């Protein structure tokens, strides 16, 4: 639908972004990015599937046939969501959270779940 700030004069940017995400997911607007012919890890079935992946405002909004402002052909490339390490003892790693992130991000771990006291212990007093 192409919502803009002039649409009502008072719609804030966050709402416009959310409306854009909805419209892209519904196929009414072009995605910001479409990864064409991408093979992705289906974390529910454990299988590799191949489809187009639509991205709007930095979020994956759909799989299937989408048009994009930017399109990248991905035959033979595998796309995988960020991994979540659901049980980590950060304190036992003997490194700061920033150093830990530098070590795990290149391997696909984007999220960790740890006890708050461990974060406090490794952050120090600074």
Describe each region flagged by the PLM.
Residues 3:
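Conserved glycine-bearing catalytic or ligand-binding loops at nucleotide- and phosphate-handling centers
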Residues 7-34, 39-81:
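Histidine-rich, glycine-flanked metal-binding segment
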Residues 66, 74-126:
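Metal-associated gating/positioning segment near the N- to mid-region
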């Amino acid at each position: 639908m192409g919502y803009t700030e002039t649409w009502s004069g008072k719609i804030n940017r966050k709402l416009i972004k959310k409306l854009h995400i909805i419209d892209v997911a519904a196929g009414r607007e072009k995605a910001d990015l479409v990864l064409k012919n991408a093979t992705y890890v289906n974390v529910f079935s454990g299988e590799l599937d191949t489809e187009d992946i639509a991205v709007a405002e930095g979020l994956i909004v759909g799989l299937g046939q989408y048009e994009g402002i930017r399109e990248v052909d991905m035959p033979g490339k595998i796309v995988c969501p960020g991994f979540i390490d659901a049980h980590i003892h950060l304190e036992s790693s003997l490194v700061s959270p920033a150093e830990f992130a530098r070590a795990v991000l290149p391997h696909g771990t984007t999220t960790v779940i740890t006890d708050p006291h461990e974060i406090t212990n490794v952050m120090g007093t600074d």
